């Protein structure tokens, strides 16, 4: 894992473990391969600053459920059970939302590494509109 702006490294590992269960890798790449954690970290210091407190409180809630152990240290079935226990909390809901956003947002926002999410849904971004030069540039 690289550098984070909002998360500490242990916090990033917790969110990454959650994201991997929300959008797992199977026959197709998931949240880990799309590097969703970097999208979430960037979101929390830009457009989603108002969600920082939910994350801070949520780390405590998750730690209480895991007995202070990292979520990723548990077998997958236990991780799913632990996340199911908090799935109705604001913390889980926002991590889920941010995970999905990180899978399918434009890569320049930190997630969707190598356009993995777009490839899964067949989105071709080469057709994005760009205004032509010329009369549109004149005042």
Could you describe each region identified by the protein language model?
Residues 1-17:
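C-terminal segment of N-terminal export signals and the immediately downstream linker at the start
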Residues 29, 33-34:
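Zn2+-dependent metallopeptidase catalytic domains
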């Amino acid at each position: 894992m690289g550098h984070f702006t909002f998360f500490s490294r242990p916090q990033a590992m917790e969110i990454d473990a959650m994201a991997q269960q929300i959008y797992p890798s199977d026959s197709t790449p998931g949240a880990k391969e799309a590097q969703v954690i970097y999208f979430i970290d960037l979101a929390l210091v830009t457009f989603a600053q108002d969600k920082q407190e939910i994350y801070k409180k949520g780390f405590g809630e998750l730690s209480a459920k895991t007995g202070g152990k990292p979520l990723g240290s548990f077998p997958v079935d236990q991780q799913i059970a632990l996340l199911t226990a908090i799935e109705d909390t604001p913390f889980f809901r926002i991590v889920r939302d941010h995970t999905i956003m990180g899978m399918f947002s434009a890569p320049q926002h930190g997630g969707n590494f190598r356009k993995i999410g777009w490839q899964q849904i067949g989105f071709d971004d080469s057709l994005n509109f760009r205004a032509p030069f010329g009369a549109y540039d004149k005042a």
